[in-house]
């Protein structure tokens, strides 16, 4: 005998405020944004998922010295985000 299930209740996600500051990018994201077009030009018939995989492989192959500029950009972006977030929260309160 099968018992009827109760319908699942949908949880509604809170709408994101369009005025909220953009989140900080990671060092990998700065690297990926800079190198995505290069990977695509080297492999024109590659799929979207494979581009990400190639970028991940390239990122892992970098030495800490080669990653340094991207990590510096990420630190600067994190500071930008934190200051913008502070300003944003002050306007809400």
Curated annotation (Swiss-Prot):
Residue spans crossing the bilayer: none
Tell me the outcome of changing residue 18 to A. Does not affect affinity for DNA
GO aspect biological process, one term: protein-DNA complex assembly
A GO CC annotation given for this chain: nucleus
Q: Where is the composition biased (Basic residues)?
A: 7-16
Note one Pfam family from the annotation. Answer: HMG_box
Where in or outside the cell? Nucleus; Chromosome
Segment Disordered: which positions? 1-23, 69-93
- Amino acid composition bias (Basic and acidic residues), ranges on this chain: 69-87
Q: Does the keyword Transcription apply?
A: yes
Could you list this entry's UniProt keywords, alphabetically sorted: Chromosome, DNA damage, DNA repair, DNA-binding, Nucleus, Transcription, Transcription regulation
Q: Which InterPro entries match?
A: HMG_box_dom (IPR009071), HMG_box_dom_sf (IPR036910), HMGB (IPR050342)
Named from the GO MF annotations, one term is: DNA binding, bending
Impact of altering residue 30 to V?
Does not affect affinity for DNA
CDD domains in UniProt: HMG-box_NHP6-like
The effect annotated for residue 21 to A is:
Shows a 4-fold reduced affinity for DNA
Xref: PANTHER family: HIGH MOBILITY GROUP PROTEIN DSP1 (PTHR48112), MITOCHONDRIAL TRANSCRIPTION FACTOR A, ISOFORM B (PTHR48112:SF22)
Protein task: DNA-binding protein that induces severe bending of DNA. Required for DNA-binding by the FACT complex, a general chromatin factor that acts to reorganize nucleosomes. The FACT complex is involved in multiple processes that require DNA as a template such as mRNA elongation, DNA replication and DNA repair. Also augments the fidelity of transcription by RNA polymerase III independently of any role in the FACT complex. Required for transcriptional initiation fidelity of some but not all tRNA genes. Seems to be functionally redundant with NHP6B.
Describe its partners and assembly state: Weakly associates with the stable SPT16-POB3 heterodimer to form the FACT (yFACT or SNP) complex, which is associated with nucleosomes. Multiple molecules of NHP6 (NHP6A and/or NHP6B) are required to recruit the SPT16-POB3 heterodimer to DNA.
Other known facts: Present with 3870 molecules/cell in log phase SD medium.
Q: What family does the entry list?
A: Belongs to the NHP6 family.
Q: What is this protein called?
A: Non-histone chromosomal protein 6A
């Amino acid at each position: 005998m099968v018992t009827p299930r109760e319908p699942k209740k949908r949880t509604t996600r809170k709408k994101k405020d369009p005025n909220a500051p953009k989140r900080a990018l990671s060092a990998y994201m700065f690297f990926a944004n800079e190198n995505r077009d290069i990977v695509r030009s080297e492999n024109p018939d590659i799929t979207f998922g494979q581009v990400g995989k190639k970028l991940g492989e390239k990122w892992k192959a970098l030495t800490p010295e080669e990653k340094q500029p991207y990590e510096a950009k990420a630190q600067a972006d994190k500071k930008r985000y934190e200051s913008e977030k502070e300003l944003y929260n002050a306007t809400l309160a």
